[in-house]
Amino acid sequence: MKIFVLLPRIPWPLEKGDKLRAYNQIKQLAKNNEVILCALNADKKANKEEAFKALQPYCKSITFIDISKTSILINLTKAFLKGLPIQCGYFYNKKAHKKIHHLIERHQPDMLFGQMIRVAEYLRHEKTKKTIDYQDVLSMGMKRRSEIAPFFMKPIFNMEYRRLKKYEHDIFDDFDIKTIISKQDRDFIDHSKRDEIL
């Protein structure tokens, strides 16, 4: 099977949990499948050459799409005005979306795989069968942060919590397969069919 994997960050070096999870998922998927990797990159200091070397043994094709800080600021504003979670706005870019769509058309994968809801906007309307790895429940993390935030930041964290919770629900039916780290996390997804999450 040919699988198109979309990540919000280049999964190298392995200094963060989401990068480590993505790297291990790619290794596992590559055992019996052809992996087409596409990773967004907002880090100017990222060593793309080193990352490419580390990932090449497991991927048939690797594409890194750079997102500038200016573009991030513009898209954060757009997300805020549209009612989307700020975290989704941070990683969304219209030019990147076009590139991703063209990559999908070119490679004709059998399955799309997106890591975290941060990349869901790029994949949710594609016709190909698709999987979303919720990883964990971002809305609950935001709720916890709102509880310890200074009073002047609470409205912002609470707004993001509500938006994330709604978005986690809204994208559920756009994906054929859903995965998550634990049953405990799964139970926090606000959807009547959450038991379908693997």
Task: Tell me the role of every PLM-derived stretch.
Residues M1-T63:
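N-terminal subdomain of nucleotide-sugar transferases
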Residues K69-G89, T131-H169:
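Acceptor-binding helix/loop patch of EC 2.4 sugar-transfer enzymes
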